UniProtKB/Swiss-Prot annotation:
PROSITE patterns named among the record's database cross-references: SPASE_II
Catalytic activity: Release of signal peptides from bacterial membrane prolipoproteins. Hydrolyzes -Xaa-Yaa-Zaa-|-(S,diacylglyceryl)Cys-, in which Xaa is hydrophobic (preferably Leu), and Yaa (Ala or Ser) and Zaa (Gly or Ala) have small, neutral side chains
A GO biological process held by the record: proteolysis
Membrane topology: Multi-pass membrane protein
Pfam families per record: Peptidase_A8
Name by which UniProt lists this protein: Lipoprotein signal peptidase
Protein function: This protein specifically catalyzes the removal of signal peptides from prolipoproteins.
Cellular component aspect of the GO annotation: plasma membrane
InterPro entries: Peptidase_A8
Transmembrane segment boundaries: 52-72, 85-105, 121-141
Amino acid sequence: MIYYIVALVIILLDQWTKWLVVRHMEIGESIPLLDSVLYLTSHRNKGAAFGILEGQMWLFYIITSIVVIGIVYYMEKEAKHDRVFATALALILGGAIGNFIDRIFRGEVVDFVNTYIFTYNFPIFNVADSALCVGVGILFLKMIRDERKAKKEKNA
């Protein structure tokens, strides 16, 4: 149950921050937070990461629905006794639903975190995107750890 609360907190934080951007900023407006490094920039994305598949909303609806159903299934069946796995899935679930809400009600995703890494202007993102990336990163690291553990047990 706690993991669904984590997902809900991600969704609420994501939607609240997007609401603030939509309400208080014009599209394209940028507010420096840390000059040359971090900006709040009001941006809209009609596609996926990096703007790919722009205008393919029906595809996002189908994929997101399948992903959400799969995550809930795994949270109920597989992750009950694995806190790391459940946390990763909760982050992914919250992020997926956060962006799904935008696609359903706005027809686009509100992005606003604009960072520069050295001279590279990283694609603008939001709270949901961050949760998705952290969740996937945790899953990736968990898979590596589990694989190493299985090899170690096999060789013992």
